[in-house]
Amino acid sequence: MNFTVIIPARYASSRLPRKPLLDIAGKPMIQHVWEKAQQAGATRVIIATDHPEIEATAKAFGAEVCMTSDQHNSGTERLAEVIEKMQIADDEIIVNVQGDEPLIPPVIVSQVAENLDRCQVNMATLAVKLTTKEELFNPNAVKALADKNGMALYFSRAPIPFARDHFADCDDAFVASQNYLRHIGIYAYRAGFVKQYVAWQPTQLEQLESLEQLRALWYGEKIHIELAKQAPQVGVDTQEDLERVRRILA
């Protein structure tokens, strides 16, 4: 099975300026992510960036780079530009790996590609089982619901499903359902679908929840969810995250 990994690497970050270039154990963060994608067995790994400093750094460690606009509203829009510019075939499997995930396990990068390859859908993703009630009620931990065939029913920052008879007590609410899933923000797409996705108008649901994947569900597309073989560690969003990752990789 062939698949291409595209790593969006945006220069501007309100909390961590120049984030993809920040040093971790002697390498820029983006290089760690690129190496993980290479280890996953991808046929091709492309770094998509909007800044010449990231382009130069990535080329220096041997990466293929595609320069993109700095006006995109989402990572998916950046993917679509890469697919168009690089003339990637519509049936190619594209895996979107975030540029701030230096600890992403290579096994889940290949897993999400294999998940899409097996399913007759245009989009696939992964989830893990929720393990604490704190995660359940944390809006930054996105919850996922799937049907008996693993097809997504909904994604939300709210605690879903709602345990009606137990919800007054958070502990009981967590115990009442063993079906709580936390979504992992890694996706595989058919390349042609990415172009279709960005052609659709944004929807009220995705804007309300601030979850891009809800656009696909709104327009009637199916998303297959599989349990991840390995739970990834948290990506780098803050200075505290950066210091923790530096300690891990020291």
UniProtKB/Swiss-Prot annotation:
It comes from Actinobacillus pleuropneumoniae serotype 5b (strain L20). GO terms for biological process: CMP-keto-3-deoxy-D-manno-octulosonic acid biosynthetic process; lipopolysaccharide biosynthetic process. The keyword Nucleotidyltransferase applies. The gene is kdsB1. The keyword Phosphoprotein does not apply. NCBIfam families: kdsB, PRK05450.1-3, PRK05450.1-5, PRK13368.1. PANTHER family: 3-DEOXY-MANNO-OCTULOSONATE CYTIDYLYLTRANSFERASE, 3-DEOXY-MANNO-OCTULOSONATE CYTIDYLYLTRANSFERASE, MITOCHONDRIAL. This is 3-deoxy-manno-octulosonate cytidylyltransferase 1. GO terms for molecular function: 3-deoxy-manno-octulosonate cytidylyltransferase activity.
